[in-house]
Amino acid sequence: NMKKALGGGYVAYLVVAVLLAVITGIWSEMGVVQLVIWVIFSAFAAIASELIVGISAMYSGWFPGFATALIFLIVGMLIGFPSLPLGILVAYTSATGPAFSDMAYDLKCGYILRGCGQDQELELEGRKQQYISEIIGFIVAFILVAIMAKQYFSQGLFAPVDATFAATI
């Protein structure tokens, strides 16, 4: 059920946005009204980025992820978010769309490899296995980033997009 899946995704993004808002809001001493606006905006930005990038990246590559993150950066600046919450917002929104696109590619490929849904039982089992594989991939990626991030960034290895975001701010 698409409506249930998107609704569940939005709730999950909202929960993460609330957690990020509380942490960054307390850290940067945001006012209550600004904090509430940030929570709502970041949840909207995440779901919008997920849909825009997820759908368009299947046809036009990774550029939409950069473009939507830049748009949310500019809108966040116009709203007046402090730099720390704004940086978190941009990172948050830029992560949601490409993740959705990757999952769409994975599911589409699996669907084709399993015979385009001709065997319903095989299709459901295949989706379950893909889901488990993606969770394992997420856990491995999380651990590697936690271990290697400090070493990576201490060498000045930043994605080229950081210069655009920094120049915009």
Which residue stretches match the model-derived regions?
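Alpha-helical multipass membrane-protein architecture
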Residues: N1-I169
